[in-house]
């Protein structure tokens, strides 16, 4: 639900956007120093990729004041063999997805990961619970991709 001026007047009420934001902000704040840079340079921007286009736009607007800037990953970074760069410096692509916990109506599982140049750097799963006011992170697990077939 977007107004003509690009501002959001309403966000879908499924609650998943708030959970995604809580998990993503935690991941952005806690990314390792090693993952914050590409070689000797810091990333020019963080690209956001969410399959829900409204959530993707909302995340970019809500996190607009973060440094490095938050941008739409689709415009600046592709999964092709020729990664696109933004002004000659790389964009770290952040992925967010969320699903409701079928066994608990106020809990959500959020997947947050970051990818650089087709190499999956890290994925984390966040289990969050909503108390009617705020989201609380109950558990964070790193996905071990080294044992994947």
Please annotate each region the language model reported:
Residues 123-148:
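Short beta-strand edge/turn micro-motifs at domain boundaries
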């Amino acid at each position: 639900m977007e107004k003509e001026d690009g501002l959001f007047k309403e966000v879908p009420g499924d609650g998943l956007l708030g959970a995604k934001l809580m998990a993503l902000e935690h991941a952005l704040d806690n990314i390792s120093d090693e993952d914050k840079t590409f070689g000797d340079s810091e990333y020019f921007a963080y690209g956001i990729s969410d399959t829900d286009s409204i959530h993707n736009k909302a995340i970019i607007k809500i996190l607009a004041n973060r440094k490095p800037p938050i941008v739409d990953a689709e415009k600046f970074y592709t999964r092709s063999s020729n990664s696109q760069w933004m002004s000659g410096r790389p964009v770290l692509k952040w992925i967010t997805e969320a699903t409701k916990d079928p066994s608990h109506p106020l809990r959500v599982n959020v997947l947050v990961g970051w990818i650089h140049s087709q190499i999956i750097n890290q994925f984390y799963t966040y289990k969050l619970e909503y108390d009617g006011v705020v989201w609380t992170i109950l558990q964070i697990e790193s996905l071990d991709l080294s044992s994947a077939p």
